[in-house]
């Protein structure tokens, strides 16, 4: 059995590595961040995997205990049966058979682990996650963000930044400890239990909120994914926002490099800060920094100024890289979705991908046909069936949470399955794995989509920064134990009977040591998940935002908006330029190296397929009928259309601001929802009558003028069409 247990841990380690590899690369972030995050993820996932095994082992030990306690009675019954004394009683025979069957059913589970070993493993993983969450990850996050040029300086700064927080916690902990010793007269073990109860209470609050959102959003997002026209419309709307975000990030990077240029110009040779300035300059993207001819600022260089500037540059490069990838990924998703829609009328039964390599080999044709069948006949049905299955699982979990309040009788479906089924049945073992696995999926997937002021955000294809992955690991560790404790609660495996308590419950201890929390808190607080689910189902968050004049558009198949038309034009234009210039998406390239403040190697973050625009001979553009055509594609000085459009838009925007003298009666600003939004993209709403919808966020003020109709991403482009403008002014909110 120990071999199976080791195999399970190896599988958990591989799973942790696979998921972690989706978001970060060892080449991109410091090695110590990668290892510490991997350890935290591994211990958290291991706790989730071990709990179902723990439940099976506990049920097996309980069965053996009952069988052993009745062994004498069983022997007497067997003797009576052999002598024929009870042959006339059918009821007694039925009872005898039931007892014998119960005895025979106590078979050892396929992954049985002794109670002592499980408790030791739980203690190691649980207290390891506590250490990482409350000590290692906060210090490491501050260390990674520090702009100091020496190791000692970065360590000192990270300790100082966290010292205030630890001081507050220390004072509160000291007061509580004195109160527990003086008033409650608790011993050391009880105080440790109190600390665990406080930590688990905070974790349980997070679990209820995140899981409540995920239980509704997971099946709904899968159902919405089957409506391709709606998804494409949302991508068109989102492309404009991402283009604006990309421009802002690039402008911040250029502004930072201008400050660096000014300091470099004023720094003389053999200056004591020259080596630090060289480190900062070497981190700037070479091609972009070469275009910065004149600096800005006072140019005064002190150590504190250079430290702050180094940190600012690292953040600017990270944000620019992130914005570039998100915009690129949005375009790729739109291109692929258009290719799938066009393949429906394909006579050769093949999906003609615009930006994918064609398959090669003897089975290439068959694989292409199978792929075409999947996208045109199977995918939509599979998505809808999966959405229905997940919706049923969500209802099962919500009912189990609701059943916790009924302590006098057991109405939990999962609890009754565990109690009245044979533990050796492999089907029952999988029944235990699936609900907890689905809980972890809904909770963790919501955590991975969280973005706090666009600062902590996990980006797939290894484009996440170190601080975001540390933040996710810290909260992942906080959620593991409370999630499992809640699962054990609603299957009634946490009673006070020693033989009926799981090893996990023994390690976690009782929660009665916290008087203002107590057992009732863990029974009735999960009922709030019903409120969270209903709020998510009926889009209460969106309605609150609308009341605050932060418009959230409800996307359905009939929804139309000027920004969707603009995004459609943008995506079509980018498709032509990608095709002409043979541009490949960022997701197909390896991520850039890490931004280490102590390194002197230049860092390049932009696509290798892009080249710079020649100022002497920029590409010629013909604008007619809403199309932009590049007539200089064969010129050696021609760059990618994306780089030219960005520079063209920036120049046009500056001209527009100068011509209007900043007297425009409106102000246009397209924003991301930078609140604690759960979704990596935009929230999904329900449009009523069974029609799912998307949310998109648009600020309430818009910019326009008498001589120009400005649209986000293309401030002056409508002036070139002559005649009536294609896009009308958006109404002021």
From Swiss-Prot:
Upper taxonomic lineage: Eukaryota, Amoebozoa, Evosea, Eumycetozoa, Dictyostelia
PANTHER family: G-PROTEIN COUPLED RECEPTOR-ASSOCIATED PROTEIN LMBRD2
Listed Acidic residues bias regions: 674-685
Protein name in the entry: LMBR1 domain-containing protein 2 homolog A
Annotated GO CC locations: membrane
Organism listed in the record: Dictyostelium discoideum
Membrane topology: Multi-pass membrane protein
Main localization (coarse): membrane
Family: Belongs to the LIMR family.
Spans traversing the lipid bilayer: 1-21, 33-53, 125-145, 163-183, 191-211, 386-406, 423-443, 468-488, 513-533
Positions with biased composition (Polar residues): 596-619
Stretches assigned to coiled coil: 232-266
Domain of life the protein comes from: Eukaryota
Region: Disordered, residue numbers: 581-641, 649-668, 674-696
The entry's keywords: Coiled coil, Membrane, Transmembrane, Transmembrane helix
Disulfide bonds: none
Subcellular compartments: Membrane
Regions of compositional bias (Low complexity) in chain numbering: 620-640, 654-664
Pfam annotation, one family: LMBR1
């Amino acid at each position: 059995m120990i071999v199976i247990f080791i195999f399970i841990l190896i599988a958990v380690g591989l799973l942790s590595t696979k998921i972690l590899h989706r978001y970060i690369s060892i080449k991109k972030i410091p090695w110590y961040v990668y290892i510490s995050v991997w350890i935290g993820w591994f211990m958290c996932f291991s706790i989730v995997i071990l709990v179902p095994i723990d439940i099976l082992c506990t049920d097996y030990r309980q069965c053996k205990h009952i069988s052993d306690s009745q062994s004498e009675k069983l022997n007497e019954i067997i003797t009576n049966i052999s002598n024929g004394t009870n042959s006339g009683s059918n009821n007694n025979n039925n009872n005898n058979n039931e007892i014998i069957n119960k005895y025979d059913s106590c078979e050892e589970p396929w992954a049985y682990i002794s109670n002592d070993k499980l408790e030791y493993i739980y203690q190691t993983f649980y207290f390891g996650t506590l250490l990482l969450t409350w000590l290692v990850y906060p210090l490491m996050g501050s260390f990674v963000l520090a702009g100091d040029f020496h190791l000692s300086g970065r360590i000192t700064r990270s300790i100082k930044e966290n010292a205030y927080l630890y001081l507050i916690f220390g004072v509160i902990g000291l007061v509580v400890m004195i109160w527990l010793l003086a008033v409650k007269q608790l011993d050391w073990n009880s105080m440790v239990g109190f600390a665990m109860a406080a930590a688990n209470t905070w974790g349980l609050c997070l679990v209820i909120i995140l899981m409540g959102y995920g239980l509704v959003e997971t099946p709904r997002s899968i159902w919405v994914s089957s409506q391709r026209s709606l998804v494409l419309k949302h991508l068109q709307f989102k492309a404009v926002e991402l283009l604006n975000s990309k421009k802002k990030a690039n402008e911040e990077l250029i502004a930072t490099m201008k400050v660096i240029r000014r300091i470099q110009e004023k720094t003389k040779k053999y200056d004591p800060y020259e080596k630090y300035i060289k480190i900062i300059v070497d981190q700037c993207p070479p091609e972009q920094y070469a275009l910065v001819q004149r600096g800005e600022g006072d140019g005064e260089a002190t150590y504190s100024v250079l430290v702050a500037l180094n940190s600012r540059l690292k953040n600017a490069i990270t944000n620019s890289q992130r914005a570039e990838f998100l915009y690129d990924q949005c375009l790729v998703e739109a291109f692929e979705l258009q290719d799938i829609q066009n393949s429906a009328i394909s006579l050769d039964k093949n999906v003609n991908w615009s930006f994918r390599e064609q398959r090669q080999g003897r089975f290439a044709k068959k694989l292409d046909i199978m792929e075409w069948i999947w996208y045109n006949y199977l995918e939509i049905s599979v998505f809808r069936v999966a959405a229905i299955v997940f919706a049923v699982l969500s209802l099962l979990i919500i009912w189990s949470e609701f059943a916790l309040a009924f302590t006098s009788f057991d109405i939990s479906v999962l609890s009754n399955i565990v109690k009245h089924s044979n533990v050796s049945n492999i089907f029952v073992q999988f029944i235990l794995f699936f609900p907890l696995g689905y809980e972890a999926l809904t909770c963790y997937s919501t955590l991975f989509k969280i973005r706090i002021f666009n600062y902590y955000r996990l980006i797939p294809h290894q484009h996440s920064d170190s601080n975001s992955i540390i933040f996710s690991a810290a909260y992942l560790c906080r959620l593991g134990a409370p999630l499992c404790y809640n699962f054990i609660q609603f299957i009634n495996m946490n009673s006070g009977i020693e033989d009926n308590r799981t090893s996990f419950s023994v390690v976690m201890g009782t929660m009665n040591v916290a008087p203002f929390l107590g057992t009732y808190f863990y029974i009735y607080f999960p009922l709030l998940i019903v409120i969270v689910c209903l709020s998510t189902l009926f889009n209460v968050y969106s309605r609150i935002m609308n009341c605050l004049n932060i418009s959230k558009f409800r996307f359905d198949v009939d929804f139309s908006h000027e920004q969707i038309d603009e995004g459609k034009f943008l995506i079509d234009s980018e498709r032509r330029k990608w095709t002409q210039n043979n541009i490949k998406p960022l997701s197909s390239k390896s991520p850039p190296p890490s931004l280490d403040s102590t390194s002197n190697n230049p860092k390049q973050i932009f696509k290798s397929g892009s080249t710079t625009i020649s100022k002497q001979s920029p590409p010629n553009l013909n604008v007619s009928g809403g199309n932009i055509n590049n007539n200089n594609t064969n010129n050696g000085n021609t760059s990618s259309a994306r780089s030219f459009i960005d520079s063209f838009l920036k120049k046009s925007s500056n001209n527009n601001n100068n011509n209007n003298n900043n007297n425009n009666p409106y102000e246009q600003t397209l924003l991301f929802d930078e609140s604690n939004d759960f979704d990596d993209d935009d929230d999904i709403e329900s449009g009523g009558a069974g029609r799912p919808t998307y949310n998109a966020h648009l600020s309430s003020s818009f910019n326009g003028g008498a001589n120009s109709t400005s649209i986000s991403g293309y401030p002056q482009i409508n002036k070139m069409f002559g005649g009536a403008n294609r896009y009308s002014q958006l109404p002021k909110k």
